[in-house]
Amino acid sequence: MLLGKRQRPPINRTTSLSEIKFDLNLPSESEPSNQQKPTVASPYGSNGQAVTAAVDQNRGFLDQRLLSMVTPRGNLRRHSGDFSDAGHFLRSCALCERLLVPGRDIYMYRGDKAFCSSECRQEQMAQDERKEKGKSAAPAKEPAVTAPARAKPGKGRAAAAV
């Protein structure tokens, strides 16, 4: 008997975009084309219409099938690093105020606090725990409201009602 993690079945690969076949009534790849295959910098021409390219997919150029799937707005898929609309809390560490550098790990706490290191994050967690303990201990230390003391006849002492 082996200790540790149990064996898992291998992960089956899904079909990628290059393996999907589309029937778009375009000329087949077997038809002869020009010897010079143009490279296309943009999938749209100057007038906004889609440009069709007869280029070889194996050489890494754009393919007609892929160009026909592009939306007219030109919103091509981008990486998350391309978006500069990051929240203001992702610019600097919430504890030490260092700038958070793109490409480095960011440690999050409570969903809206970003930290440059796990140590800063841990320190903030400790500070929050101290605040929470202080809040929960504060109501117990409050003085109790007392009724005016009444002297019992014959004893001469005042007793406070609690």
UniProtKB/Swiss-Prot annotation:
- What cellular-component terms does GO give this entry? cytoplasm; cytosol; endoplasmic reticulum; nucleus
Note down the stretches annotated as region Disordered.
25-47, 121-162
Intrachain disulfide bonds? none
Mark out the compositionally biased spans (Low complexity): 147-162
> Null mutant: what phenotype?
Reduced biomass and lateral roots and shorter primary roots.
Q: Does the keyword Membrane apply?
A: no
User: What domain of life does the native source organism fall in?
Assistant: Eukaryota
Which BP terms does GO give this entry?
response to starvation; seedling development
Q: Tell what triggers its expression.
A: Up-regulated in response to prolonged energy depletion. Up-regulated by the glycolysis inhibitor 2DG. Induced by abscissic acid (ABA).
Expression by tissue: Early expressed in hypocotyl and cotyledon. Later expressed in old or senescing leaves and in pistil, pollen and filament of open flowers.
Chain intervals annotated as zinc finger (FLZ-type) = 88-132
The subcellular localization recorded is: Nucleus; Cytoplasm; Endoplasmic reticulum
Question: GO molecular function of the protein, one example?
Answer: kinase binding
Polar residues bias: start-end ranges: 27-47
Q: Which family does it belong to?
A: Belongs to the FLZ family.
Outline what the protein does.
May act as an adapter to facilitate the interaction of SnRK1 complex with effector proteins, conferring tissue- and stimulus-type specific differences in the SnRK1 regulation pathway. Negatively regulates KIN10 leading to a repression of the SnRK1 signaling pathway.
How is this protein organized at the quaternary level?
Interacts with KIN10 and KIN11 via its FLZ-type zinc finger domain.
Q: What is the name listed in the Swiss-Prot or TrEMBL entry for this protein?
A: FCS-Like Zinc finger 6
Q: Which gene encodes it?
A: FLZ6
